[in-house]
Amino acid sequence: METLKDKTLQELEELQNDSEAIDQLALESPEVQDLQLEREMALATNRSLAERNLEFQGPLEISRSNLSDRYQELRKLVERCQEQKAKLEKFSSALQPGTLLDLLQVEGMKIEEESEAMAEKFLEGEVPLETFLENFSSMRMLSHLRRVRVEKLQEVVRKPRASQELAGDAPPPRPPPPVRPVPQGTPPVVEEQPQPPLAMPPYPLPYSPSPSLPVGPTAHGALPPAPFPVVSQPSFYSGPLGPTYPAAQLGPRGAAGYSWSPQRSMPPRPGYPGTPMGASGPGYPLRGGRAPSPGYPQQSPYPATGGKPPYPIQPQLPSFPGQPQPSVPLQPPYPPGPAPPYGFPPPPGPAWPGY
């Protein structure tokens, strides 16, 4: 189109009347040139592909012939397999447990009839003794063997039938329980396992079985009435294991510089043995009094009891009707004796708060 812009009207009229010039102008256009180039490139590509395919022609023919041979071999193998399968079906039908059982029964009856016939001939005198002894024993042995085989084969035939009947009579398995959908916002609930019962006596003891040890777990709530007197025992505190402060000396006056009041002093009790001087030490009382105090007031380890036991006695619980009452007065469970040299006074109340 650009070449036609520069031409005059007369040249355009001449070009219109000249068909060769129009054809030349069309061939020289860039669009036609591009198409021509693409055509030449496609022809070259097709030529190269054709040459490459011709190179694979020989291996392709060889592979085709091999495939044909293998196919013929496959057909022969299929025919042979069909023949072997027919033979196997024929033999298997003859060797079925039911068929074998029938054949064994027939042969067993046959050999038994032959042996009976020989015995009858021997009794009639038609068969000599030597022939009868040789043949009759072998016949009877074969008859017994076949009878045993028939019995065993009958057991083998019955077992699969019994198993099939049991499998048919068995109920179908139960489906698993459906899973309940849990909302997304709700946390999963964990089921608590029941705890095993504690190995503890049904009723706690009315007294402490070990007075020198700390008090164990106490009973909560009222306990049922017991048929024996209930008392409580004090629990003594053994004190710290290390050296303690020396006790104050008994008497109107203590150590120098310390005034001792009568309320803090207690005369020695009669009946308690004294401690030798050589056995005294830090934390141990001396004979005839207590160790001098370094300035701290000390309390007496033995409270004034006034002739009563150092532990309280609890009143007897109400007993069941018809139960005999004790004729002797109540006594503490432990006999009174020398109290330990150390310890704190017993608690004012009973040791068991549940009573």
From Swiss-Prot:
Subunit structure: Component of the ESCRT-I complex (endosomal sorting complex required for transport I) which consists of TSG101, VPS28, a VPS37 protein (VPS37A to -D) and MVB12A or MVB12B in a 1:1:1:1 stoichiometry. Interacts with TSG101, VPS28, MVB12A and MVB12B. Component of the ESCRT-I complex (endosomal sorting complex required for transport I) which consists of TSG101, VPS28, a VPS37 protein (VPS37A to -D) and UBAP1 in a 1:1:1:1 stoichiometry. Interacts with HGS and STAM2. Interacts with CEP55.
GO biological process: macroautophagy; membrane fission; multivesicular body assembly; protein targeting to membrane; protein targeting to vacuole; protein transport to vacuole involved in ubiquitin-dependent protein catabolic process via the multivesicular body sorting pathway; ubiquitin-dependent protein catabolic process via the multivesicular body sorting pathway; viral budding via host ESCRT complex
Post-translational modifications: Phosphorylated by TBK1.
GO CC annotations, alphabetized: cilium; endosome membrane; ESCRT I complex; extracellular exosome; Golgi apparatus; intracellular membrane-bounded organelle; late endosome membrane; nucleoplasm
InterPro entries for this protein: ESCRT_assembly_dom, Helix_hairpin_bin_sf, Mod_r
Biased composition, class Low complexity, residue ranges: 291-304
Domain VPS37 C-terminal positions: 78-167
Keyword Cytoplasm: no
Biased composition range(s): Pro residues: 170-186, 194-214, 321-355
Task of the protein: Component of the ESCRT-I complex, a regulator of vesicular trafficking process. Required for the sorting of endocytic ubiquitinated cargos into multivesicular bodies. May be involved in cell growth and differentiation.
UniProt family annotation: Belongs to the VPS37 family.
Compartment(s) where it occurs, according to its Swiss-Prot or TrEMBL record: Late endosome membrane
Membrane topology: Peripheral membrane protein
Phosphoserine sites (modified residues): 29
Gene symbol of the encoding locus: VPS37C
Start and end residues of each stretch annotated as Disordered: 159-355
Protein name: Vacuolar protein sorting-associated protein 37C
Record organism: Homo sapiens
GO molecular function list: calcium-dependent protein binding
UniProt keyword terms in alphabetical order: Endosome, Membrane, Phosphoprotein, Protein transport, Transport
